[in-house]
């Protein structure tokens, strides 16, 4: 195993790039399940007679629980680290998906997706993204861009595979296949999650940081939260309704998921480009340009 030690001066630790791979994969799986809701939407609505709005609320449920618990897990990570976040997320994601394969009510549908968001997506995304950032001094934008691209790529690949599974064997088998695959892929690599030595030092012996930015940290968080909230709202609504909209227009499920795949692959490439651009011109100018 690559030692998670501080590298030579002028280079980022090699283990940091392994962390990029780990979190890329975990976030790809977790966000992929969000995107897959758009593929499950019509089969579940037909199976149980649910309305389109009721079924799509599953996406809202998982997004809400992810946001709510993401704040809490961020606090926990700052206090005690995120060493075991990946393991808990892997087990929760697999369990939730397996239970969804045998759901019989709308309440169960919401409950299991809430669980997926609270202890799966919320633990596999934001706190581990922050973990990755602490590993890098020289290429943080590129590292985080590659890491974040996992969520976009996962939202393209997972729905595409789920669409094929539903077409071949039905929605229940598709959920079961996801559960087994998530456990096999996510659990082994989750044990590779480590804290960077720099973050451990900062957490155990915090130092007063000299600030030159005109706004306080709290003000920055508030404004960035509003920006991200409106950005993600505008992005997520088309994602969850794209596949049903295309199949309603008499397009095949394979075609619909292919369109989503192309869209999200482009999104992944954009995140990598934006991350590298941030290393060159700075984070704020890049955010303005990409917006």
PLM features: residue spans?
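Intracellular juxtamembrane helix-capping segments at the cytosolic ends
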Residues: 44, 122-136
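Helix-loop-helix hairpin linking two adjacent transmembrane segments in secondary transporters
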Residues: 146-197
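Residue-level signature of mid-helix packing/kink "hotspots" within the transmembrane helices
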Residues: 35, 63-71, 155-156, 264-272
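Extracytoplasmic
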Residues: 15-52, 69-73, 158-159, 235-243
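Helix-to-loop junctions at the C-terminal end of transmembrane segments
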Residues: 69-82, 270-282
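Hydrophobic core of transmembrane alpha-helices in multi-pass small-molecule transporters
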Residues: 27-28, 96, 107-123, 229
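C-terminal ends and interior cores of transmembrane alpha-helices
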Residues: 91-104
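Extracytoplasmic gate region of multi-pass secondary transporters
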Residues: 37-42, 217-276
């Amino acid at each position: 195993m690559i030692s998670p030690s501080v590298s030579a001066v002028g280079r980022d630790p090699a283990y940091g790039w392994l962390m990029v791979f780990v979190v890329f994969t975990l976030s790809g799986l977790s966000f992929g399940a969000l995107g897959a809701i758009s593929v499950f939407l019509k089969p579940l609505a037909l199976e149980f007679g649910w309305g389109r709005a009721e079924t799509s609320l599953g996406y809202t449920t998982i997004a809400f629980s992810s946001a709510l618990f993401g704040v809490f897990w961020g606090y926990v990570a700052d206090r005690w680290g995120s060493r075991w976040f990946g393991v808990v997320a892997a087990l929760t994601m697999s369990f939730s998906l397996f239970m969804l394969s045998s759901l019989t009510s709308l309440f169960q549908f919401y409950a299991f997706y809430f669980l997926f968001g609270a202890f799966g997506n919320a633990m596999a995304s934001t706190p581990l993204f922050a973990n990755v950032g602490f590993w890098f001094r020289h290429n943080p934008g590129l590292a985080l861009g590659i890491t974040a691209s996992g969520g976009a790529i996962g939202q393209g690949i997972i729905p595409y595979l789920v669409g094929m599974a539903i077409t071949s064997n039905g929605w229940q088998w598709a959920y079961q296949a996801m559960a087994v695959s998530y456990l096999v892929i996510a659990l082994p690599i989750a044990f590779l999650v480590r804290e960077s030595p720099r973050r451990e030092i900062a957490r155990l012996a915090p130092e007063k940081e000299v600030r030159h930015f005109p706004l306080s940290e709290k003000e920055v968080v508030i404004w960035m939260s509003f920006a991200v909230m409106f950005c993600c709202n505008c992005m997520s609504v088309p994602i969850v309704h794209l596949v049903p909209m295309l199949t309603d227009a008499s397009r095949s499920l394979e075609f619909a998921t292919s369109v989503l795949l192309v869209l999200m692959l482009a999104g992944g490439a954009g995140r990598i480009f934006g991350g590298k651009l941030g290393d060159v011109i700075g984070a704020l100018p890049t955010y303005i340009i990409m917006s």
